[in-house]
Amino acid sequence: MSKLKGKVAVVTGASKGIGAGIAKALAAQGASVVVNYATSKSGADAVVDAIAKAGGTAIAVGGDVSKAADAEHIIDAAIKNYGRLDILVNNSGVYEFSPIEAVTEEQFHRTFNINVLGVILTTQAAVKHLGEGGSIINIGSGASLMTPPNSTVYTATKGALDAITGVLARELGPRKIRVNSINPGMVETEGTHTGGFIGSDFEKALVAQTPLGRIGQVTDIAPVAVFLASDDSHWLTGEHLLASGGLR
């Protein structure tokens, strides 16, 4: 299949987890992919290798999306190596759950810098090159709708991302650039394992409330990104697709 043949995509935070899955899925549909990483070059290289072994095309590019110069560098890598940009997936994100009494200024600024400022800076760099038919996909969270306890800062960033998605859909619509978000529920990734969520009472509570009876997998989210990146979704913009197995 080649829904994205000839297209060029940038996926931020793609060295593992949801970002890695999306990068692989876009490449499998024919896109050339810039696999961005902040610190894990080895992880990004592994994603690039997996794409190459499957017959796809990708490069790994380092950069901190919360820094304007780095955001420009990431986008410029797509132009330098592939000559164009069609798809931007703003996936980079951090999370730390804590009760309100434990929230710190450092936690607030770090989370907002990556989850919100990073999206703005990378999008700012990308729109210089995106043309008619371009697609921006923001990876939000079901947390913005479900507002779980002990997630004040993280959920605030994802609420901001929902708002940014709506604003940019209106702002960029006249240029025929679409902007949508995917809002996953809990997904099994390296991060949710490291954070102690997998196997926890929190996971069990979520599963009990989920109509489809399990937490998500990366392979549940990546096809949604392919849909939003492709012409199959040409009449969708400003949408927030809740990919959570029915949990809301």
Residue ranges, per PLM feature:
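Conserved glycine-rich cofactor-binding loop
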Residues: V8, S15-G17
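A glycine/serine/threonine-rich, flexible loop-to-helix segment
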Residues: D45, P174, G185-T210, D220
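Substrate-binding pocket helix/loop in short-chain dehydrogenase/reductase
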Residues: P99-I100, T104-H109, L206
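Active-site helix of classical SDR
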Residues: T123, T157
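Alpha-helical segment proximal to the catalytic Tyr-Lys
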Residues: K128, R170-P174, H234
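Residue(s) in the substrate-gating loop at a strand-loop-helix junction
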Residues: S141
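C-terminal helical subdomain
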Residues: S181, D201-D232, L236, A243-G245
